[in-house]
Amino acid sequence: MSEKLDKEDVLYKKRHSIAHVMAEAVIELFPNTKIAIGPPIKDGFYYDFDFEKHIIEDDLLLIEQKMREILKTGSSFVKEVITKEQALMLFKDEPYKIDLIHELDIADEISIYKSHNFTDLCKGPHIDNMGKIDPKAFKLISIAGAYWRGDEKNKMLTRIYGTLWNNEKDLKAYLKLREEIKRRDHRKLGRELDLFSVHEEIGPGLIFFHPSGARIRALIEDFWREEHFKNGYDILFTPHVGKSWLWETSGHLDFYKESMFEKMEMDKSNYYVKPMNCPFHIAIYNTGRHSYRDLPFRWAELGTVYRYEKVGALHGTMRVRGFTQDDAHIICTYDQVKFEVQEVLRFALYMWNKFGFTALKAYLSTKPEKSVGDEDDWIMSVKVLKEALINLGIDYDIDEGGGAFYGPKIDLKIIDSLGREWQMSTIQFDFNLPARFKMTYTAEDGKERQPFMIHRALLGSIERFFGILVEHYGGAFPVWLAPLQVVIIPVNNIVEEYALEVLSRFKKEGIRIKLDNDCNMRMNAKIRQYQSQKVPYMFIVGEKEVVEGKISIRTRTNEQINGLELKEALEFVKLKVSNKEIL
């Protein structure tokens, strides 16, 4: 569920208004520029321009200066309603505005906003006048390319992003947070820590996990599987492709085709790589007959799916074209629904906690205007979702009418160490696919009934969750997730025999450890190197440690733990791993 912006919020109006101020400043500085659209967004605003000349980051300072000059006038924002004919005449030299106007119906209200020397096609809302904007509380922050209307077939425009806050203090706090976000960017850390790569020449949006990143991914997936078995799930494996009839039956080719890869023709049949796992799980269900005594089925899969995303929308491991969903489908009876939903919710909270996420937000989306399924089933399922949230003490917001046409859902968002929300788990009823695929079971009264089906993801996708973890921890993973947990650094060659003994002892206990006996680098340089690589522990081995049979530990945060017995050091690390300690 995307976050909705409150159009009546004063800050929203300010950001909308300053986008107009920026557009006016740009036109004054670059007179032949054509304007497109400029909305407020979370934390700021942007405007898309068609420049005659290429602009650079240095130009942003000139634009900011001109914006402050315009703000000093204190001009009002005045709304006027005009006809479509008047709008076409007013914006006759603005091709992007004309494009928008042509889409409007003759009966539609067309509004413009005038401010200082600028007029824009706009629905609003805006603040009354520019005097309400603190000229020290905004900053233009970046330039990017953006296709007109988001369509790669259209011209690439120049998008200028800015941020605006109520005062200078809030602006500085945001800019500081922004710098920390840049420092933790999973794409940057992915290169620095050698975790993953993307190869445009092979295919955009396709992730290559390197040994260290693959180790972390394997640890996530192993834990996922272990916990699913503990919670009564069976693990499935299904193909990556399926014939077109499957996607016709599921409705994907009717409603989801734009997000699917093109068909492949083989053996006189059309195949598609799967955008979702659900139809495959249903195919397994439909291979046999089922009684109410067999239910519930809890079927989970780390299933790789493929979805066509526009190149401009791709973002590291967060937005990709091929990704692995931690997918599950619960197939159950009416009487089992309440328990199953509550258990899924409890399971989600448990999993997040183990990865270090304790803060969350929940959203319950209810029946939309157009829907499928029995009215009583909708009422019951919404009630069950509400009760599950209440029983587990989870505060939630209701998105009335925001559910999918095939069923209500709970969306759960985690809040990371930088205060950002990330969509993670979804618990979604489906009244559509069971009917489309004619799923049935024999009820207690001997009649054939349609089972309830609940779609469920806990981590969302492994690739995206991986990127979130990288940024949440800034690459300094908890010991249990660290690809390399310990490095032994001997102070000289004399102690190497003892260092090898430590290495062997820890390896036998499953600790991910290595010995750095490179004589060409000083010890302090090695410590700095491994701290920059976010290795949790460095074991410093000198002659004193050899004589006493002990270990001195330096942590990646530069803490020192001296004089631990070898057995104590081993237990110290093992405890951090077995308890999945976060700090």
Swiss-Prot record:
UniProt keywords, alphabetically: Aminoacyl-tRNA synthetase, ATP-binding, Cytoplasm, Ligase, Metal-binding, Nucleotide-binding, Protein biosynthesis, RNA-binding, tRNA-binding, Zinc
Main localisation: cytoplasm
Entry GO CC: cytoplasm
Cross-referenced Pfam families: HGTP_anticodon (PF03129), tRNA-synt_2b (PF00587), tRNA_SAD (PF07973)
EC number: 6.1.1.3
Annotated positions binding Zn(2+): C278, H329, H455
Oligomer status and interactors: Homodimer.
Annotated HAMAP family: Thr_tRNA_synth
This protein's name: Threonine--tRNA ligase
Natural source organism: Borrelia turicatae (strain 91E135)
Gene that encodes it: thrS
